[in-house]
UniProtKB/Swiss-Prot annotation:
Gene behind this protein: rlmL
Keywords, sorted A to Z: Cytoplasm, Methyltransferase, RNA-binding, rRNA processing, S-adenosyl-L-methionine, Transferase
Protein name (database record): Ribosomal RNA large subunit methyltransferase K/L
Organism from which the protein derives: Pseudomonas putida (strain ATCC 700007 / DSM 6899 / JCM 31910 / BCRC 17059 / LMG 24140 / F1)
Chain ranges of the THUMP domain: 46-157
Residues annotated as transmembrane: none
Amino acid sequence: MSDRFELYLTCPKGLESLLAEEAKGLGLDEVREHTSAIRGAADMETAYRLCVWSRLANRVLLVLKRFSMKNADDLYDGVHAVDWADHLAADGTLAVEFSGHGSGIDNTHFGALKVKDAIVDKLRNREGLRPSVEKIDPDVRVHLRLDRGEAILSLDLSGHSLHQRGYRLQQGAAPLKENLAAAVLIRAGWPRIAAEGGALADPMCGVGTFLVEAAMIAADIAPNLKRERWGFSAWLGHVPALWRKVHDEAQARAQAGLAKPPLWIRGYEADPRLIQPGRNNVERAGLGDWVKIYQGEVSTFEPRPDQNQKGLVISNPPYGERLGDEASLLYLYQNLGERLRQACMGWEAAVFTGAPQLGKRMGIRSHKQYAFWNGALPCKLLLFKVQPDQFVTGERREAQPEGTEARQQVPQASEPARLSEGAQMFANRLQKNLKQLGKWARREQIDCYRLYDADMPEYALAVDLYQDWVHVQEYAAPRSVDPDKAQARLLDALAAIPQALGISPQRVVLKRRERQSGTRQYERQATEGRFQEVNEGGVKLLVNLTDYLDTGLFLDHRPMRMRIQREAAGKRFLNLFCYTATATVHAAKGGARSTTSVDLSKTYLDWARRNLALNGYSERNRLEQSDVMAWLEGNRDSYDLIFIDPPTFSNSKRMEGVFDVQRDHVQLLDLAMARLAPGGVLYFSNNFRKFQLDEHLMARYVVEEISAQTLDPDFARNNRIHRAWRLQLR
């Protein structure tokens, strides 16, 4: 075999230039960058050195052959031409990985089989024995990449991906791969800071990946020094003496690095469940003297190195994937910025984020940004110098002390945001509305009400108070509105709400209200299962602000529910499309003789059952899971008081066809009126803004529109929120 080889090193997308620089420093020549990879030339010693020392590569591939191919036969022939007896024992084990397509190979599994067959046939014809396939831990792992008609056949020297250092056996919900963490540290300037004796702190350290990688860089520890099994361990071209030389050198450097006084490297994590796994990872890496992990909130983050030295604050905040996370993340970033300005003057900071727009809310200018990919997610690394001339004042933020409570998941900001002019106007409007509506709500003993409903066109939000929680719904912006401007106004509003209302940011829940199709409006959006009890008209109701688009309580129908309570005494009450049966609870409170509630959703009927039980009602209250139209066609009972509040549009696997309130309301009302007892009343309401009641109904029944009577002061600004009618038999 030649003394020089072509090597192909793979890496996460975005790390190519960093890997090229690192590989050159380790001896790779003629380096060229490709997408998610680099290639170059080196001897065997350098190949070993790259395996043990590369902090950034995924794999080190030794190229055996390049050949052109037009079809599957060319693939077989090209692989078969290699003298495989130089690489693999005839009775050994192998695994084959195939990537790319073209030249008649459109299935990677088929391509891998052709490569395997060529290797097996070559060895069997020569030795009379054949190797077997072992996917997990083979003697030799062969890789073939097909790129625009050229096949690149390689041996994988690394074995398992090099990002698997062996110390992180326990990880959190959103782990950062070790080589990506190392790349972020390098871009953030940690090698320079460490060489100067600086400190490092991570205020949201998870299980400590940044901390361990930082300590290995500072202590000159090869990232894969402890790896025992390599892709070259059973390769017949392996040179053990040369490998021992490279490994012994790395071992000596690690011992020398660990003999130095350790740098101050600390991590803080709010989730107590991650503390011990993080500490276990540190111990497995042999860095217990260098790295310490403590439980701590971002709101109390204050690094205090032993020698008062400055250093690097590095963090990978949560990205936010659940409904309502955006508000929490905004406050988290604001709080992180505040702690940096208050407790880390003179430090450098690096924030790795999948939501770079939130970095603008930290109150510090980012002097440099780098693009990365975390898997398929585009991310940015924001670099900061924590010094006064980089602080953003005026329209964004300015430090002002304010005592506030600490929070478990998204800490309360220790100082308020300096609001933009528009956000301050929004805050002023909230306070004005609170003053006016608050008096009414207290007088009426109402816990939950709408405080703001797109009063200012540029802030297209609905803001509802649920006791000391705020439920914010963002209306989808028209296509003519610049998405970046809409996002900026949303973030401004979210910054203003806690200040204007004097509440903890943790108690702000954000959702986006868009045009819903089918049953999407009823689908579960998260799984927190957090229910809270609220009061309305003497009844107790359960709401859930996080898990669904709606909360379980339609605030605009409050007057209708109160009307039902007043009129229900001694009546047989029927609630169709009952949702969580809040109107049924009011009817029971008002003394209804019996209640029947019908809905297709088991989830909401379970919720309804809990609402009834919460108020002590059970035996005389029937809950029916059924398609309302089908149920009405099969029911023959009579009712004195009926309430119908259907969705605008609905479909389900459990129902026949699709319900459309405009198209189907005549049939619905005719079926329901057939169940109305003489002298009874039916209330019909819906939220379809373009709805028109069929005029033929007015000829058949006594119909009175009562929409204006069903709006409380909190919805008086939006008299199109719903329409309602009172129907009786003629």
